[in-house]
Curated annotation (Swiss-Prot):
Belongs to the dCTP deaminase family. One of its GO terms (molecular function) is dCTP deaminase activity. Homotrimer. Catalyzes the deamination of dCTP to dUTP. This is dCTP deaminase. The gene is dcd. SUPFAM superfamilies: dUTPase-like. CDD domains: trimeric_dUTPase (cd07557). It catalyses: dCTP + H2O + H(+) = dUTP + NH4(+). Pathway: Pyrimidine metabolism; dUMP biosynthesis; dUMP from dCTP (dUTP route): step 1/2. It comes from Pyrococcus furiosus (strain ATCC 43587 / DSM 3638 / JCM 8422 / Vc1).
Amino acid sequence: MLLPDWKIRKEILIEPFSEESLQPAGYDLRVGREAFVKGKLIDVEKEGKVVIPPREYALILTLERIKLPDDVMGDMKIRSSLAREGVIGSFAWVDPGWDGNLTLMLYNASNEPVELRYGERFVQIAFIRLEGPARNPYRGNYQGSTRLAFSKRKKL
């Protein structure tokens, strides 16, 4: 069952919370302080924006910390305005028990650069209640992330 706006406000810890980001059946995550593009770490808060060049990907940290109960998971989709500009998002489930900021991957499939401003809404997360709490909620490598989390599979 998808959680409606009033249950999201009541049951999901989102910091910092923005009323503008709360949607009828989800929450719009915003561009956070760090990004990684073409091998470079970008201080988005300082620069005010991140630019994804044509045919390139970016890792972007969410502004929000999300903490999920053991019986709720998250499913994310790119906002349609960005999809209409040729931006594709590849996102994993947000497992029950997750706590931290999220590192998300966007790919600019267009022939034009795409600019995202610090604090701009870019991905919507919907929260889905499980039939019961997970026996083994997430406690993995990325738990508690507050900075960009790179793949544990290889060194950059």
